[in-house]
């Protein structure tokens, strides 16, 4: 029996281990280069990165969306008293400030949706693109 036949399992394990280590080293190198480009201020290189953080809206754009006090809008639509903010899952209460998100016209607590929109430019309910 040849040497390779007796140690076939060991050889397969060794090649699999070498492949895994090579994959890890290449992945580490790619991440390191991407982080260096971002730290050096190379915006174009960082922009070409496959993993970009989600972009939200700026504070000025968020504040431009209509806001109102819940007690003023409660009588407009029947059943509005049962509404809740889907971001924090709390019911709307009197004297709380709400914000309306165009174009889908969903309503949320102003503080909740402001935080959401600063990280994401989509509606928390329907994922419609929110454009200021």
Swiss-Prot record:
PROSITE patterns, per database record: ZF_RING_2 (PS50089)
Cross-referenced InterPro entries: RING-H2_zinc_finger, Znf_RING, Znf_RING-CH, Znf_RING/FYVE/PHD
Keywords, in A-Z order: Membrane, Metal-binding, Transferase, Transmembrane, Transmembrane helix, Ubl conjugation pathway, Zinc, Zinc-finger
Membrane topology category: Single-pass membrane protein
Compartments reported by the entry: Membrane
Gene Ontology cellular component terms for the protein in this record: membrane
SUPFAM superfamilies on file: RING/U-box
UniProt signal peptide: none
GO biological process, one term: protein ubiquitination
Domain commentary: The RING-type zinc finger domain mediates binding to an E2 ubiquitin-conjugating enzyme.
Protein name per Swiss-Prot or TrEMBL: RING-H2 finger protein ATL39
Lineage of producing organism: Eukaryota, Viridiplantae, Streptophyta, Embryophyta, Tracheophyta
Gene: ATL39
